[in-house]
A protein has these predicted regions:
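Conserved thiamine diphosphate
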Residues: 104-153, 159, 186, 194, ...
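Short acidic, glycine/serine/threonine-rich loops at helix termini
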Residues: 34-37, 60, 81-85, 107-114, ...
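Thiamine diphosphate
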Residues: 1-133, 161, 224-225, 248, 371-511, 521-522, ...
């Protein structure tokens, strides 16, 4: 049977067909849909973990126990999971272990453009790299076999375009492999220094065998065409090159990106007149090719920054035929990202504007949009968890300079569970004056409303224990009187809490609790706001909320009732009572 699938759907299907039994992940674009689709296969136990490190440890434990296991994350998630990744390379596995890393060239939804191919090189584990959905399915199945044959985790690298593009896939049936017998082996699985020292040379021997495999792997293939131009490439870059050049070039398509196939590269390079290496972001393949003493054209012609596309490739390989593939003459209005109408974060950021002398350290989530006009409410955004820990650093630096500058650390509920708890402990332990604002919108909203430990539901929909953020704050040492919960739709309550937090001289926590506006609050389903033109002075104060439902049109203020979610924050901002509630 055939089906049209995204790369993420095909990865999930491949895991199912391979007999995978356990899967764990933390949501992050462009990888999120992998686990969501895996969860549709009831034969596989699937879970959202609190962060990528935990997810890989869960999957790693399952693999050592004898089950085939999969772990998925976006590229920056592998930074979080690097600790177990490197050690699992030493221990090896029992059942197959595949770690999917979804890189994001072009930074569609990320804070950096790191190239995770270097993780395979650094951790010394094999890496596969598909170029379309069919290969996503086939390569995942192969990855599990490779993992078990070589007793090693396999890194599976995809990129945004592979994850989200659709292509035709041939489906197969599930292979039931069961759970292998687990045998206790402390010298293999307990990495104290003495045992780890013994495992390192074993890993090096595996690498020698993997290098031989790469030279003979069907995943690395030569496609002969015109030998005047030779192209070494991998992943989505192969699709771009093939689209532009067709049979007017020859290709060495790399499907096993580590170890790279040295013999195959030498043979291919000798057979072509001019050699190009086409890859997104870092010159990973190019550096290896040049280390073999082979001359090639790579990043001196292709950009390091951003995605590649057929137009960019054509400008280099065939400039005389260059066409503006993606250019359009139509001028469309810009649509910058904004917090949704009725977003519960808006009230907090609006209220924070009062404290112009304060520093606000932000974090990763929908609330990252608080950086942008008209809210302009955030000073830094580094990585998950840094909303609190970077705030501690600011506060300590200001103290060293004898500056009494207030610092607010802002993060969401899922981010708090991910990596904010340890940061809050650090704030308490080191007696920081930081005030923390946790925006609890009852979901992991930015990646598509996944469950988290605060929702009381698991990925499969089972009822679980609700982890109370206020109780965590109290448990790690924040004083009871320094923990407040507010409804961010209530501006007066929110402003009073922020005033206390601003004046606090010890760790202070505000939990702003209100469900994401897109979760369709039943109580406000019929509530809308409208502008009373007779009362409105056109002061445009309401526009400072940055709500996409509010606009100044044809010389007057207007609220788009089809977009309004009835949060009523604009009503509270208007000093003239010109915004009124409609419905019930």
């Amino acid at each position: 049977m055939k089906s049209i699938m995204t790369g993420n759907e095909a990865i999930a299907r491949g895991a199912y067909e391979a007999g995978c039994l356990v899967a764990a992940a933390y949501p992050g674009t462009p990888s999120t849909e992998i686990l969501e689709n895996v969860a549709s296969y009831k034969e596989i136990y699937s879970q959202w973990s609190v962060n990528e490190k935990v997810a890989l440890e869960v999957a790693g434990g399952a693999a050592i126990a004898g089950a085939r296991a999969l772990c998925a994350m976006k590229h920056v998630g592998l930074n979080v999971a690097a600790d177990p990744l490197f050690t699992l390379a030493y221990t090896g596995i029992n059942g197959g272990l595949v770690v999917v890393t979804a890189d994001d060239p072009g930074l569609h939804s990320s804070q950096n453009e790191q190239d995770n191919r270097y993780y395979a090189l650094h951790a010394k584990i094999p890496m596969l790299e598909p170029s379309d959905s069919q290969e996503c399915l086939d390569y995942i199945k192969y990855a599990f076999e490779l993992s078990e044959e070589y007793d090693i985790p396999v890194l599976f690298r995809v990129t945004t375009r592979v994850c989200h593009s659709k292509s035709l896939v041939t489906l197969g049936s599930r292979q039931e492999v069961g759970v292998k017998e687990y045998k206790k082996d402390v010298k293999k699985y307990c990495m104290i220094p003495g045992f780890a020292k013994l495992r390192h040379p074993i890993l090096e021997e595996k690498l020698k065998r993997l290098r031989e495999l790469s030279d003979n792997s069907p995943l690395n293939q030569i496609i002969w065409g015109d030998k005047r131009i030779g192209i070494i490439t991998s992943g989505i870059s192969f699709q771009h090159a093939r689209e532009v050049m067709g049979d007017a070039a020859s290709y060495l398509k790399i499907g096993m990106s580590f170890p790279l196939p040295e013999r195959l590269i030498r043979e291919f390079a000798q057979a072509v007149e001019v050699l190009y290496v086409i890859e997104e972001n870092e010159p990973y393949i190019e550096t290896f090719v040049k280390s073999l003493g082979i001359s090639c054209i790579g990043k001196d012609a292709f950009p390091v920054c951003g995605e590649l596309n057929p137009e960019i490739v054509q400008r280099v390989l065939s400039p005389e035929k260059a066409t503006k593939t993606y250019a359009v003459d139509v001028q469309v209005p810009s649509r910058p990202p904004v917090l949704c109408a009725g977003c519960p974060h808006r009230g907090i950021f609006y209220a924070l504007r009062k404290y112009k002398d304060a520093v606000i350290t932000g974090d990763i989530g929908c609330y990252s949009l608080g950086i942008l006009p008209p809210l302009n409410a955030t000073d830094t955004l580094i990585c998950m968890g840094a909303g609190i820990s970077a705030g501690i650093g600011f506060e300590k630096a200001f103290a060293q300079a004898n500056r009494d500058t207030k610092v607010f650390g802002v993060m969401g509920d899922s981010t708090f569970f991910h990596s904010g708890i340890t940061s809050l402990i650090d704030a308490v332990y080191n007696r920081s004056k930081l005030s923390v604002i946790i925006l609890d919108n009852r979901t992991t909203a930015m990646t598509g409303h996944q469950e988290d430990p605060g929702t009381g539901k698991t990925l499969s929909g089972d009822v679980s224990t609700v982890i109370d953020i206020k109780e965590i704050a109290r448990a790690v040492g924040v004083k009871q009187e320094n923990i407040l919960q507010v409804d961010p739709y209530d501006l007066i309550q929110t402003q009073e809490a922020l005033k206390q937090a601003y004046e606090a001289t010890e760790p202070f926590v505000i939990v702003a609790k209100r469900s994401c506006a897109l979760l369709k609050d039943v109580q406000r389903a019929n509530t809308k706001c409208t502008v009373n033109a007779e009362k409105c002075s056109k002061c445009k104060l309401c526009l400072r909320l940055g709500c996409p439902a509010i606009a100044f049109k044809e010389g007057k203020m207007a609220i788009d009732e089809s977009a309004c979610n009835g949060c009523t924050v604009c009503m509270q901002v208007c000093n003239l009572g010109a915004i009124e509630r409609t419905g019930r």
